Each structure stands twice: as structure tokens, then as C-alpha cells.
């Protein structure tokens, strides 16, 4: 099992929301946490999409060695599933098959009125507020905003995978975003079951792990595969 966060995608050029140089430490008219909330989206969709298109829809982003290393482990039958807090879809772009996106995906959209699913390529992002071609209501990304709960099916299936894992690798996450970070407690960390952590710096979970590796996750996972 692999459980990953924003640090998995930083080597692709995406910002880590909570690092020192990350998105949440930059200055905007509103705090990013407020902009990326349900209430803000409903009240100020124009400002929401301005931020969303500028900071989350970054063109030319491609999978990095970490994504491809995980795909290789999955292909070899050594990795049963990937649970990610990321919304960028890079695991699937790298060819990974069993991916649970706890916070949704920027590649899926639906309208707020009737939940019509709108293919990404059919959305006109040149407008200030994209509208549904069927009912003309607002379109929103299928991502979990602040004030919203996680998808129950994805949550329960993720927990089941963690409970059945004999090795859990955690990478690129500060484990500060709940309820996603709380899933780690479902891992049966006893007997021969091992917990491995890969991060660039020290964190609160280090002392509980059987192995902690500090460094770039792409380089470390590539070495594991080779």
C-alpha cells in the first residue's frame, strides 16, 4: 500500500500547499483555505475560478519518477493500491490502475443543480464561471472543498486496503489534513507488518515507523524499483 500527499507531485512542478514555499504561504485577497471552501465557491464563484485556474490548472504538468516507480511496483504485483490526497491525476497519467483519490480530481466536473457530469474537454474555461451545457447552472470541479466531507465509498475502500496491508509506505505528506491523515490509524502495525515513511524533512510520525527515509521521493522510489 502507498499513501501519498502533495510532496509526491512537487517534483512535477506543482506547489506543496503546506510547505514553507507552498501555496498556503502566499498572499491573496482571501486566504487559500477560504477560497477553496464550499461557502466561498457558492458565494464568489468568479473569484474561486480565478484562483482555481491560476493555481491549480497548471498546463504541461507531467508525472515524475515517483509516479512511474509506483506504477512499476503495481505492474510487478508488489503494490495493491495507491491512496492519494492529491487532485492532479498524475498517478493515472503514469499508468497506475488502482488509485483512490480522497480529495477528488481536477479532471472531473459536474453541475451544481442536476449533477450532470461534464467531460473536461467540453468545459469553456475562458469564461469567468463555466456553465453546464444542459441546464446552464454552475459547473464545479469534483474535488473535496473545505467544509465538505470525503466520498464514503472511496473512504471505506481505502480503509479496507489499509487494514489488509502488510506494508504501508507513506510519502510526501505532513499528515496534517484530516480526516485523510486519520486513515493511518487503521493500519495493523504489529507482527511482520511494516510502516515506512518517505519525506524531505522530519515529522510527527517518524518515531512510529520501522523505516524513515529522508530525501526526494522520486529518487528514493526509483532506487527501490531498480
Residue ranges and their predicted role:
Residues 1-226:
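Conserved catalytic core of sirtuin-type NAD+-dependent deacylases
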Amino acid at each position: 500500500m502507498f499513501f501519498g500527499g502533495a510532496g509526491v507531485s512537487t517534483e512535477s512542478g506543482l506547489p506543496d500547499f503546506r510547505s514553507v514555499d507552498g501555496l498556503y504561504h502566499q498572499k491573496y485577497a482571501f486566504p487559500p483555505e477560504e477560497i477553496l471552501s464550499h461557502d466561498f465557491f457558492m458565494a464568489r464563484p468568479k473569484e474561486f475560478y480565478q484562483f482555481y485556474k491560476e493555481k491549480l490548472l497548471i498546463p504541461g504538468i507531467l508525472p515524475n519518477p515517483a509516479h512511474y516507480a509506483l506504477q512499476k511496483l503495481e505492474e510487478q504485483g508488489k503494490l495493491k493500491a495507491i491512496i492519494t490526497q492529491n487532485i492532479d491525476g498524475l498517478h493515472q497519467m503514469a499508468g497506475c490502475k488502482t488509485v483512490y483519490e480522497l480529495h477528488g480530481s481536477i479532471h472531473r466536473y459536474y453541475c451544481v443543480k442536476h449533477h450532470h457530469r461534464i467531460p473536461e474537454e467540453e468545459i469553456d474555461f475562458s469564461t469567468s464561471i463555466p456553465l453546464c451545457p444542459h441546464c446552464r447552472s454552475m459547473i464545479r470541479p469534483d474535488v473535496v472543498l473545505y467544509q465538505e466531507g470525503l466520498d464514503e465509498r472511496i473512504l471505506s475502500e481505502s480503509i479496507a486496503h489499509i487494514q489488509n496491508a502488510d506494508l504501508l509506505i507513506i510519502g510526501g505528506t505532513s499528515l496534517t489534513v484530516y480526516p485523510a491523515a486519520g486513515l493511518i490509524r487503521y493500519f495493523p502495525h504489529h507482527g511482520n507488518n511494516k510502516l515506512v515513511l518517505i519525506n524531505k524533512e522530519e515529522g510527527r510520525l517518524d518515531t512510529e515507523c520501522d523505516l524513515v527515509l529522508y530525501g526526494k521521493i522520486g529518487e528514493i522510489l526509483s532506487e527501490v524499483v531498480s
